[in-house]
Amino acid sequence: MKEIAVFGLGTLGKSLAISYSNMGGKVIAIDKSQEKVDEISDYVTFAIRADLTEENVIKGLGVSNVDVALFSFFTLFIR
């Protein structure tokens, strides 16, 4: 199976990460909330806390070799 990275562990991201992992896939799950990372860590290959709104964070996560990257988060930018 392909290795996926799921960025954002809200309702959709968490469900996708756990479902794919239960099918035998390798999953890297990433969220800025340590609580969400802790909740999913037993179900996925790796769970990482990172703030994806910071520049260059994705490059430093070591996910450049995954087969699929899913971005499932919402950030409202107000000026």
Where are these regions (language model features)?
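Cytosolic regulatory regions of ion transport systems
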Residues: 1-79
